[in-house]
Amino acid sequence: MKRRHLLQGAAALAGASGFAAPSLAQPARTTTLRFVPQANLTALDPIWTSAIVTQMHGYHVYDTLYAVDGQQRARPQMAAGHEVSADGRVWRIRLREGLFFHDGEPVRAADCAASLARWSRRDAFGQILAAQVDEWRAVDDRTLEIRLKRPFPLLLDALAKPDSNVPFIMPERLART
């Protein structure tokens, strides 16, 4: 055996010995999410304040019927989709199946109607939309109907609004406050 082969084998054996070493102790898996906002969370209601920290908190607790995609187009979020009447004055938005709030209660169209009515009283874009709305109503538990005085082509853009006062859907009992 040549000396070179002996040295190569010894080097390979020394390098490989580290692979068999026991692993270091790993911390136990944790299920706690730590949230560190940029400011103190002084208000929990994302409709009655435009504070970014409250808006971010709102995104962790609530959801929206529509959201914008990467191309800034409104896409269904909680909604399964929508139908618009031929004259553009009646919008029916169908909720996806299996939607629940954090307390385990199912999301109903009545929650959506109350939430949107509340949001539209506070938000500037919502107020423009509300001026065109005759009625927000729940047809059944999964169908929201929005009746307009005249067509409002920006309705989905309003419902997908991602900033300032976001049209979050919350339980009816909270939205009625």
Model feature map: region roles:
Residues 54-58, 108, 140:
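Hydrophobic (often cysteine-bearing) scaffold residues that line and stabilize catalytic clefts
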Residues 128-177:
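Surface-exposed binding/hinge segments that line
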Residues 42-46, 68, 100, 123-128:
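Pocket-flanking alpha-helical
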Residues 30-39, 90-92, 145:
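Short, well-ordered beta-strand elements
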Residues 28, 75, 128-130:
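Short, glycine-/polar-rich solvent-exposed loops and beta-turns at beta-strand/coil boundaries
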Residues 80-125, 139, 145-147, 155:
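Aromatic- and charge-enriched surface segment that lines or borders ligand/interaction sites
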